[in-house]
């Protein structure tokens, strides 16, 4: 298993993963359908630069992901990360994917 940051080179594998996740567990997804073109567009949009998706990969396929955002408080300079999404395909759960 290896990890990659979501980018334009692996976005198609990411979309395939989302489709599979939607098929297997539609109630776990936060959308009704996968906006493929929207995903591709957001990867090039500077607004989303502070959002990062790390993909867990096996055999050139995405099996899990974590999305997080860095932000800080102006008042005290406190820096933090907010994890907004963690999802691992059911057949890869309980194998340490999310811990890595």
Where are these regions (language model features)?
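A conserved beta-turn-beta hairpin within the catalytic core of GNAT-like acetyltransferases
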Residues: 71-83, 93
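Conserved beta-strand in the GNAT
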Residues: 53-55, 61-70, 82, 87
């Amino acid at each position: 298993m290896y990890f990659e940051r979501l980018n334009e080179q692996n976005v198609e594998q990411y979309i395939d993963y989302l489709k599979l996740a939607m098929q297997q567990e539609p109630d776990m997804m936060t959308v009704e359908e996968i906006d493929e073109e929207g995903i591709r567009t957001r990867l090039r949009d500077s607004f989303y630069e502070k959002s990062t998706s790390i993909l867990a990969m096996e055999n050139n396929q995405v099996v899990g992901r974590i999305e997080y955002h860095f932000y800080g408080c102006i008042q005290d300079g406190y820096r933090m990360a907010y994890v907004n999404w963690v999802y691992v395909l059911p057949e890869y759960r309980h194998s340490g994917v999310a811990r890595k």
